[in-house]
C-alpha cells in the first residue's frame, strides 16, 4: 500500500507466473476490499501483462498502471521493499528447505515489516501504526 508502505497482499512460489501474481492480488483484495478505480501499479513483467491478470483486475474494478519501459524509479517503493527483504533477512541465512524460507519470510512481512519496521515516510512509524494513527484521528 503506497499510503502506509504496508504489504497487503503477497504470495510465494518457485516461479514468477501469472498465477503467482494473481494469488498476491487476491490476497491484497481480501485484506483491503478496495473501492473500484484503485490503481494497481507494477513493473512490466509478462505475468502482469497476462490475460488472466488483466481479467482479474477488470473483474475487481482496478486500474492497471505499469512502469515505463526501462525505468525502475516508477516502481521504487516495491523495489525498495524487496531490497530491504533481501538485505535484512535473506542474504543473512541459508535455508535447508523452501518451507523454512517461506516461514521466515512470512514472519518478516507479517510480524516485523508491517508491525515494527519504521518508515521515514510514515513519520517514523510502522505501517500498521501509521494507518491506525491516520484513520483513528
Predicted regions mapped to residue ranges:
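Charged DNA-binding/catalytic regions of mobile-element recombinases
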Residues: 1-137
